[in-house]
Amino acid sequence: MHFAVSGKSGDRVVFDHAEVLDKDGNFYTANMRSAKNLIEYTLRGGEKEEFEPTFTFQGFRYIRLIEYPGDISLDDFKAYPMHTDYKKTAEFECSDSDLNQLYKNVLWGQDDNFVDVPTDCPQRDERQGWTGDAQVFIKTAAINRNVGALFNKWLRDAALEQPGSGEIMMIVPRMAGENNGAAWGDAITICPTEIYRAYGDKTILADRFKSMERWVEYIKAQGENPYLWNTGHQFGDWLGLDAEEGSYEGKTDKFLIATAYYAVSCHNTAMAAEILGYTEKAKYYNDLYKNIKAAFADEYLNEDGTVKQQTQTANALVLYFDLTDNKTAVAADLAKLVEDNGKAMTTGFVGTPYIIYALSDNGYASLAYDLVLRREFPSWLYSVSMGATTIWEHWDGLKPDGSMWSEKMNSFNHYAYGAVASWFFTDICGIKYAAPGYKAFEIKPVLDERLSFANAAIDTMYGKIRSQWRKVDGGAEFEIEVPSNTTCRFEYNGTKHAFGSGIYKFTVCA
């Protein structure tokens, strides 16, 4: 916040910051916990003075003037957004204004939290580089902005803090505590992999490969069975809505989650080894991955490949992480769980980023749309209906009557659940990379009767990719843009085309 003020020497300007107002319209700071978010400035006197904080930042929508000399003019106060200096690389718009607002909220949440470090929140007494938040959001982050340099630096910090055991801290830079855990520490393999896929630069894989290896070997050494991760501290499906009363941990078996992520990290490490030409290491990690996958099946799947524990998160992870040979049955189980819950999610930090993909990739795109377009709690659009401008930590952080979910853990600027926005590009508009950096890509849009048009663009290393569709009588009209030196495969409703660079307009019959 920048302000101008006139007064005599010794006069003071004092104000604090808040994200929301309470149900009576009062300034609300309880969710800041011990953070004061207070600015105090003492005037030297004489000419008009201007000031803005240099060594701190705040996450806020409102300020409250506690002391101020003279008359107050809004013209003397200006709020400036602060974030890492990176390039905007995406656009999205559709016929649903609430969905458009949700995407804007995702962007604000990302920018507000990407200030040199990807923090969980920018306002309360935390503001820390939680690895779990970063990894669930990385796919969306890399679409919205060019985050290659930011994550290269942050992952280097993670590697520097990696102890001899190979574990990855839950917070980078390390702030407190010794705990790590699945889905959090796995940022060291997931983030480099997604950065490589988005930008096509294998340098980040080369730079982080040793850390990826050490993390996988750390997990392997944790229990008696080297192919299961079933020991130690785990966050589980954090903030899952199926948690027991008084708990933040969702119902899904935390060791199912841990072993699923163990498989993913091993698979990512094997892939990195192949890309980097490390033939023997690639074979070692591919073999290890197969053994982990087999052990996972023995421990957590039924003989027919369905999941023993029937939760939304368990089924979503098994589908998205390709841990079953019977995706048809697992997808049907997931769909039934969602349907039986009133077409609403019970997932937390771990399950939420994947449930939409788990449905739409396996024949339930309409149900995925049901979740994305749902307005009632729990849903992404509930917060939009409550006037949100960023992504909330809790689905019902602010309740319909204006009361708060909690004072202890109730951030209104927590970007992790904004991971859903990648689906706007990959499925609503259908842009999916088929080769690193989008050297080759697909456009396979998934239309729904509740949207009449959608338009998305991604600025890749080769130029702009655009996918735009609009419903017309008898079918849908498409406009796609293919950048130079790339190839595109288009598919919709049985129609298939292959395109080189250029701009194309055509109609596909229903």
Segments predicted by a language model, with ranges:
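The feature captures the catalytic groove of carbohydrate-active enzymes
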Residues: Y28-A30, K36-I39, G45, T119-C121, ...
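Structural helix-adjacent loops and short alpha-helical linkers that scaffold large soluble proteins
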Residues: Y68-D76, L99, A142-L155, Q162, ...
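Extracellular/oxidizing-compartment recognition motifs
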Residues: M1-R124, G132-D133, A149-N152, A158, ...
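Non-catalytic C-terminal accessory modules of carbohydrate-active enzymes
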Residues: K23-D24, S366-A510
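Helix-terminus loop motifs that line ligand-binding clefts
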Residues: K23-K36, R145-S247, E376-G402
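Acidic, mature catalytic/reactive cores of soluble proteins
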Residues: S9-K23, P81, E93, F209-A221, ...
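Alpha-helical support elements that line or immediately flank enzyme active sites
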Residues: M1-E19, I66, T131-E161, P192-K202, ...
